[in-house]
Amino acid sequence: MSANEQWDIVSGVGITALAVAVARARESRRDDRLIDDPYAEPLIRAAQPPVPMSGDGGEAGALWHEMTDYVSVRSRFFDEWFARACAAGTRQAVVLASGLDTRAFRLEWPEGFRVFEIDQPKVLEFKDGTLAAEGVRASCERHAVAVDLRDDWASALVKAGFDPALPTAWLAEGLLPYLPPEAEANLLATVHDLSARGSRIAIESIALARSALLGADLDDTAREWGIDLKGLFSLEDRPDPGDVLAQRGWRVHRDPVGDLAAGFRRPLSDRAQQLGAAGEMVTAQRD
């Protein structure tokens, strides 16, 4: 991802958010689904991608199936993490690079809970307009913060009503693989600075699995979508995000993706395991 790149939902990093929505829609049709996202399908229809993203047929179709399993395990884990944060008394959350995330609409939140979604203006405009046209209303006090995470997003967040004096639940799902090392370091530093005692964060970390992103299977999907997927990822070495938070005094816990999949009775394929084996969900709390 280039330093000044902008995108909508069918270009650049935005199309990966659309792909995740496709995975959530596929999962929601299963009888044994791990998540239920009734809003993913309307978002896919409205996006009208330049090429079909059906996820059916051929080698790319097999990769879609495996991606759906991975996304479902990841989504279920973070859904449950939010539920625990709410039970602990947290009353505001920030979804970093929210994309087409619909948790502000599909999850149950305590009365008065505030969810701040940060993303590119075009991405938020598309999601807001589509769901409004469907008559969908948020199940919390939702604030869309249209700002690039490479800009002064902290000021925009506070201006939108975020209270840094209150404990916060931060989510970085499907974000860090796209950030250069310096941008990732700045993001974690800003989160720390804005986090009151009792705040927590959940991060999808695949730092050790970055080389697996360069496999031929990704080439198949890139050709199907007509986009340079490899060019979107930042493959430079960087410190582990859990270690960075621990050095700042956060209490860190790690859940390997394979263990989570087994716990949800959704074992990943050998190929998905190869990608996810070195990946983990990192959660941390600032005491």
UniProtKB/Swiss-Prot annotation:
GO function term, MF aspect, one: methyltransferase activity
N-terminal signal peptide: none
InterPro entries in the record: Ppm1/Ppm2/Tcmp, SAM-dependent_MTases_sf, SAM_mthyl_Trfase_ML2640-like
The species this protein was found in: Saccharopolyspora erythraea (strain ATCC 11635 / DSM 40517 / JCM 4748 / NBRC 13426 / NCIMB 8594 / NRRL 2338)
Name of the protein in its database record: Putative S-adenosyl-L-methionine-dependent methyltransferase SACE_1742
Transmembrane segments: none
Gene3D superfamilies, A to Z: Vaccinia Virus protein VP39
Keywords: Methyltransferase, S-adenosyl-L-methionine, Transferase
Lineage: Bacteria, Bacillati, Actinomycetota, Actinomycetes, Pseudonocardiales
Source organism superkingdom: Bacteria
GO biological process: methylation
Function: Exhibits S-adenosyl-L-methionine-dependent methyltransferase activity.
Protein family per UniProt: Belongs to the UPF0677 family.
UniProt: S-adenosyl-L-methionine binding residues: 119, 148-149
One matching Pfam family: LCM
Enzyme Commission number, as recorded: 2.1.1.-
